[in-house]
């Protein structure tokens, strides 16, 4: 293709436009940002409202049936499975973000491993600094390198000094 470099440039920059001095118009169709939240905890309810306001596609995964209720989580995808089961059945992309909220390594870490392997654009994990240190140590023991592990934002959140779900 004569204009391969120009087409690649538009694609990589995720923009649309006319290639200089031609009549070729490039239109990029960008998949919406998808945010996968692991953990149907009280914090998730507030986070979901924020993400929906940004027009992100939101999916909540939690294998614990008593946390997942349609009353708590309306108008979003709710998956009552272990994260590794869910990730086997869906396709994710570089437009996918992961936020883990359960504090349970048996639930959070399989999702984190998948996100690291698939190079999600954002990976965040809730928990204390000590919890995050332990999480990183276990991931390193499982073969992930420092660069991969350092791509996990953790502990996530902004220190406002509060303890309520919206503040967390």
Q: Residues of each region from the PLM?
A:
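Short amphipathic alpha-helix with an adjacent loop that forms part of the alpha/beta core around
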Residues: 84-94
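General small-molecule cofactor/ligand-binding pocket signal
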Residues: 59, 79, 153
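Segments forming oxygen-rich coordination pockets for charged ligands
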Residues: 1-63, 67-76, 93-96, 131, ...
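Short phosphate-binding/catalytic loops that engage adenosine nucleotides
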Residues: 56, 120, 144
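Adenosine-phosphate binding glycine-rich loop
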Residues: 126-168
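Cytosolic regulatory regions of ion transport systems
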Residues: 75, 106-113
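Conserved SAM-binding strand-loop segment of SAM-dependent methyltransferases
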Residues: 76-82
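ADP-ribose/adenylate-binding Rossmann-like module
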Residues: 61, 97, 102, 113-138
């Amino acid at each position: 293709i004569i204009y391969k470099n120009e087409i690649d440039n538009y694609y990589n920059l995720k923009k649309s436009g006319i290639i200089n001095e031609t009549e070729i118009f490039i239109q990029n169709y960008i998949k919406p940002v998808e945010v996968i939240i692991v953990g149907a905890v009280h914090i998730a309810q507030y986070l979901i409202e924020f993400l929906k306001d940004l027009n992100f596609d939101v999916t909540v995964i939690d294998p614990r049936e008593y946390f997942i209720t349609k009353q708590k989580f309306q108008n979003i995808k709710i998956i009552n499975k272990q994260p590794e089961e869910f990730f086997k059945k869906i396709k994710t992309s570089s437009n996918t973000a992961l936020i883990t909220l359960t504090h349970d390594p048996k639930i959070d870490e399989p999702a984190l491993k998948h996100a690291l392997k698939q190079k999600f654009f954002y990976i965040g994990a809730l928990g204390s600094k000590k919890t995050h240190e332990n999480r990183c140590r276990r991931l390193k023991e499982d073969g992930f390198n420092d660069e991969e592990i350092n791509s996990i934002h953790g502990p996530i959140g902004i220190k406002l000094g509060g303890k309520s779900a919206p503040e967390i």
